[in-house]
């Protein structure tokens, strides 16, 4: 039987993949390309080095989405030339394009959602977020199938957007690592961080990272400074909080660098050093939907993680063992207490069930099963 042929449409910058959301899209398609013929039509600013599938950077960013109408017949021609079976559109922004392409090509389309976008707009206080919520529900209802990043998002969309459960599937973010790290590697990385930053070996090392102009992460910076620092300092122990990430304002850089207990690193080429070397990853995030990719990455590195309950949506606690500690939203005293106690404990490694659940090959196989059914019906 011929492999399914998929056209992915990505209306934002993904390549080179640096941030969690970008890595999620790039890794999904790189694993999909092992089992399917893949062509990506992407936004013009993308620079891809992929050599196992075709990447065509000619689309406008979704902020100028309707300008892509000029490429509608180019896309139809591409679908015909490449014998495309299924169209996969990243995020709901360009879902309307999927409707047009289905009408022109008779090919079904999937919306690959990475969060409930209307919730993100609401949290950002966008004045038209309710308009987008109406559009998001409408376009998911028109799609032949919808992939959601978490069970929570899927259940919410089924209830509020009145979608058919049979046309919805959880396709989550995956981890690159397949098993816990060797303990010696963690010790070596910790020693490196201590030496490079001229710290006392007894210093407990915490880590927070992310795209720092993204509202949930910016709010987490505020929480670290206004809610956690004083509570930690009151416990009178040596600690430092590493903050890594890109797209941060000059004002925020100045603020972070004014606190001696915070070590602001900005964007780092090798975030794995910090995942391996820190004693504890913190996720004081309460805003946003979707899934916190940094939390999955940290757990994959066998890192002890403390998270606000809302920030851990999409990660079943039963597969994380002792390594994921959940604190009720806005209980910052409880959060600081756990930072003090958990960072000094020796815990069992992340269970094998975690690596199975967040294994990219298994995630993509689930998506392929849906694509195969859609292909057979077309």
Residue positions per predicted region:
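A charged, aromatic-enriched C-terminal amphipathic alpha-helix characteristic of glycosyltransferases
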Residues: 344-375
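Conserved catalytic-core segment of nucleotide-activated headgroup transferases in glycan assembly
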Residues: 24-30, 175-255, 264, 268-269
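Acidic donor-binding loop of glycosyltransferase active sites
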Residues: 144, 261, 276-290, 301-303
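Active-site proximal beta-strand in glycosyltransferases
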Residues: 7, 102-121
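Membrane-proximal helix-turn-helix segments that form the acceptor-binding/catalytic region
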Residues: 73-77, 103, 127-149
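N-terminal subdomain of nucleotide-sugar transferases
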Residues: 1-47, 82, 234
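Short hydrophobic beta-strand element within catalytic cores of glycosyltransferases
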Residues: 294-297, 304-309
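Carbohydrate-associated surface elements
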Residues: 152, 171-174
């Amino acid at each position: 039987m011929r492999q399914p042929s998929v056209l992915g449409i990505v209306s934002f910058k993904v390549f080179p993949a640096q941030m969690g959301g970008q890595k999620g899209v790039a890794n999904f398609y790189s694993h999909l390309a092992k089992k399917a013929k893949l062509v990506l039509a992407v936004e013009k600013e993308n620079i891809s080095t992929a050599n196992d599938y075709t990447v065509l950077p000619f689309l406008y960013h979704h902020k100028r989405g309707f300008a892509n109408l000029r490429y509608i017949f180019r896309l139809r021609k591409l679908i015909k030339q490449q014998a495309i079976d299924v169209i996969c559109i990243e995020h709901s922004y360009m879902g309307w394009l999927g409707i047009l392409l289905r009408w022109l090509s008779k090919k079904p389309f999937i919306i690959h959602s990475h969060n409930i976008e209307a919730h993100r707009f609401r949290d950002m206080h966008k004045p038209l977020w309710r308009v987008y919520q109406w559009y998001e529900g409408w376009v998911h209802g028109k799609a032949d199938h919808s992939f959601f990043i978490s069970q929570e998002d899927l259940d919410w969309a089924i209830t509020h957007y009145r979608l058919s459960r049979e046309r919805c599937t959880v396709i989550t973010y995956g981890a690159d690592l397949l098993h816990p790290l060797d303990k010696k590697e963690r010790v070596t990385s910790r020693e490196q961080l201590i030496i490079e930053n001229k710290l006392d070996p007894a210093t407990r090392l915490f880590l927070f990272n992310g795209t720092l102009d993204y509202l949930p992460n910016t709010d987490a910076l505020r929480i670290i400074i206004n809610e956690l620092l004083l509570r930690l300092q009151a416990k009178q122990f040596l600690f430092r909080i590493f903050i890594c990430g890109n797209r941060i304002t000059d004002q925020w850089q100045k603020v972070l660098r004014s606190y001696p207990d915070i070590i602001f690193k900005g964007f780092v080429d090798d975030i794995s050093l910090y995942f391996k070397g820190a004693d504890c990853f913190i996720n004081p995030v309460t805003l946003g939907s979707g899934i916190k990719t940094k939390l999955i990455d940290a757990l994959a590195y066998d890192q002890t993680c403390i998270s606000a309950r809302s920030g851990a949506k999409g990660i079943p606690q039963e597969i994380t063992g002792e390594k994921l500690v959940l604190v009720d939203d806005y209980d910052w005293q409880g959060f600081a207490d756990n930072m003090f106690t958990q960072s000094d404990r020796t815990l069992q490694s992340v269970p094998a069930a975690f690596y199975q659940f967040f294994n990219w090959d298994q995630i993509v196989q689930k998506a392929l099963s849906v694509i195969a059914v859609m292909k057979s019906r077309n």
